[in-house]
Amino acid sequence: EISLGLVGSEMCIRDRNDGIIRTDPSKKQITLVFTAADKADGADAIISILKKHGIKGGFFFTGEFYELYPDVVKRLRAEGHLVGSHSYGHLLYMPWENRDSLLVTREQFEQDMLKSYEVMRKAGIEYKDAPVYIPPYEYYNKEIAAWAKNMGIQLINYTPGTMSNADYTTPDMGAKYRSSKFIYDKIMEVEKKEGLNGHLMLIHFGTDDRRTDKFYNGYLDKMIKTLKRKGYTFVPVLEATGI
């Protein structure tokens, strides 16, 4: 399912759909990435926690987010974070039940990505600042990754296993709901069992109001402190991937 491929000078791990899902597994490094479509309730907490720990994150936003929250984008850029694309329209590229078929044409995909980079440029972000992107719903296939690559954009995604990406779930989801404590404990369990070397760890920049137990309130800070104590360094996206 997984192949090793050299990107730049770094050894990265790709999944079977050709997205980079882990950076160099021989290095005790973690990269924090954040996505948002239309919510920014985590802005103050996340910006201040990363500042406190001297960490540069990667932030991937939709076109709507850039239009709704220009001040948040400015703040992130002023702090030296990578601010990039999560697509323009948060399109669903494939049906959930069939990853091998497509709901978008290549032209629709390219138009959406061009719009995304256009709205980024208005915010002062050039292509060279953010040549990587996290696809909407973190859901893609080989064709999507190839189309992106053809535009000079490398598709990346979170390293599976820690369930950090479940921090968006809400109590009404029943069995799918994951509390912040559950997620924190799961991250530590994976660390203990196999380590988190090269992990791309995804956290949502904002979540639904129905979720009052926000991971960024308390647990994000605690997680960073614990992992630093265990000897991990937090490395920016482009440095970690060698792109």
List each model region and its residues.
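Short, small-residue-biased leader/transition segments that mark boundaries at the very start
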Residues: E1-I13
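Generic structural signal for well-ordered alpha-helices
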Residues: R16-D18, A43, I47, P70-K74, ...
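C-terminal domain-boundary segment and adjacent tail
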Residues: N17-P25, H53, E67-L68, R210-I243
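Metal-dependent polysaccharide deacetylase catalytic core of the NodB/CE4 family, i.e.
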Residues: K28-I30, K51-R178, E194-D208
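Active-site-adjacent substrate/metal-binding segments within catalytic domains
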Residues: I30-A40
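Short, acidic/polar
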Residues: A40-I47, I183-I187
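Well-ordered, non-membrane alpha-helical segments in soluble/globular domains
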Residues: L114, S180-Y184, Y216-D221
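A short, acidic, amphipathic alpha-helical segment used as a generic capping/interface helix at domain edges
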Residues: S179-E194
